[in-house]
């Protein structure tokens, strides 16, 4: 009888919820920094049609002025052209080494070009290089024809992709941005920044957009970057310029310093110098005023498990990154929402809590607390066997 009672008590002990308490919520304050950052957007006095500064990793907008004003983007159009080509490469529809035979239509393109001739053959990688560095219209059309069969079919892909990206003030009529005959070809600073952010995720783009000069045709033809900031601005690694009488001077400029990549878009400047000065001013402001707050994946603590085959599981926080004014980087606090115990069954990767990141009482965002191991619910047979081992061995085996 005594052993029967002991068995019942042992089972109750095994299945009961643990009473030990872990911090339900807490803060992990970083060093105090009394410097306050201004929330007022600066007035640069730009005389441009639109301007925007975005941090690439988070997509956070730092500065915006007439960011949805739709206008001709000129050759900045090729950001979408190159994006579709890169995505086709990823899908395996062709390779960088594939040779492309230039059509009469591609060879007929005016404006910026590398003077491709009908019937000439050039590799996909060389055509990308020509488009990225020299803004070559003939190379861009050759890539469009390779990707979709014709430039007109490619334009359909461009507009479809714009819709998928949620671009509200963008429409295309060609793959180049030549705008002397188009009537419905436009974009805005915000949409161009979104496209740019997608494009720089493809390594081959920054490989070439960061170069001041390169060559094609066995070194006999020199390509010079249309983006002078690549040569003269610290950290500039792209991306695309454009200018026509209708568009004025446009650019989507990317630059990286440390762990932060910025995208500065200028639409409709009156001169090349004004365009470059405006882009520089935005980039200078962004690098001087903002930084990335990052929390890497980390172990938090072991949490007891109720009714599972395991007794506790380690809990981890997922990575988190956000843009913060430099004056606030040292004041970000982590507030943990951690359960006292975990209920089964638990799957690997399951969310069990969260970490909130706070700055001066404002929530910046949150990351998840997860378990990396699964833990099934314990069966009655397993409970019984554990109880027996506790009674007869003095411990659970």
Predicted regions and their residues:
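Structural motif marking the loop-to-transmembrane transition
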Residues: 1-2, 73, 124, 377-384
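Sec-dependent N-terminal signal peptides of Gram-positive bacterial secreted proteins and lipoproteins
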Residues: 2-22
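A generic local structural motif
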Residues: 9, 37-39, 250
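Generic solvent-exposed, charged/amphipathic alpha-helical segments
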Residues: 10, 159, 283-287
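Intrinsically disordered, low-complexity repeat and linker tracts
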Residues: 13, 20-38, 297-303, 390-394
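Active-site-adjacent loops and short helices of periplasmic peptidoglycan-processing enzymes
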Residues: 21-194, 199-203
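Domain-terminus/edge residues, biased toward the C-terminal soluble/receptor-binding domains
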Residues: 167-171, 183-397
């Amino acid at each position: 009888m005594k052993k029967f009672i002991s068995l019942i008590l042992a089972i109750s002990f095994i299945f009961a919820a643990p009473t030990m308490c872990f911090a339900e919520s807490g803060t992990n304050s970083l060093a105090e920094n009394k410097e306050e950052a201004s929330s007022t957007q600066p007035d640069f006095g730009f005389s441009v049609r639109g301007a925007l500064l975005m941090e690439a990793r988070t997509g956070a907008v730092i500065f915006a002025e007439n960011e949805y004003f739709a206008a001709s983007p000129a050759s900045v159009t090729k950001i979408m052209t190159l994006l579709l080509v890169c995505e086709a490469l990823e899908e395996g529809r062709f390779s960088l080494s594939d040779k492309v035979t230039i059509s009469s239509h591609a060879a007929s393109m005016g404006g910026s070009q590398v003077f491709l001739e009908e019937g000439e053959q050039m590799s996909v990688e060389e055509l990308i290089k020509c488009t990225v560095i020299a803004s070559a219209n003939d190379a861009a059309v050759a890539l469009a024809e390779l990707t979709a069969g014709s430039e007109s079919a490619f334009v359909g892909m461009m507009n479809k992709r714009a819709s998928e990206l949620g671009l509200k003030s963008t429409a295309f009529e060609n793959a180049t941005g030549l705008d002397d005959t188009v009537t419905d070809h436009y974009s805005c600073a915000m949409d161009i920044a979104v496209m740019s952010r997608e494009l720089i995720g493809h390594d081959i783009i920054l490989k070439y957009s960061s170069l001041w000069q390169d060559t094609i045709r066995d070194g006999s033809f020199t390509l010079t970057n249309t983006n002078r900031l690549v040569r003269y601005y610290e950290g500039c690694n792209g991306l695309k310029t454009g200018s026509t009488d209708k568009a004025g001077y446009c650019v989507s400029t990317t630059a990286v310093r440390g762990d932060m990549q910025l995208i500065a878009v200028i639409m409709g400047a009156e001169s090349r110098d004004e365009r470059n000065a405006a882009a520089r001013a935005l980039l200078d402001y962004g690098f001087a005023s903002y930084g990335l707050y990052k929390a890497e994946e980390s172990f938090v603590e072991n949490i007891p498990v109720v009714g599972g085959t395991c007794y506790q599981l380690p809990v981890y926080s997922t990575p988190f990154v956000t843009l913060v004014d430099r004056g606030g980087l040292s004041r970000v606090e982590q507030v943990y929402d951690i359960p006292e115990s975990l209920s089964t069954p638990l799957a690997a990767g399951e969310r069990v809590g969260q970490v909130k990141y706070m700055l001066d009482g404002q929530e910046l965002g949150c990351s998840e607390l997860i378990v990396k191991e699964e833990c099934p619910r314990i069966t009655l047979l397993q409970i019984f066997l554990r109880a027996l081992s506790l009674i007869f061995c003095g411990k659970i085996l």
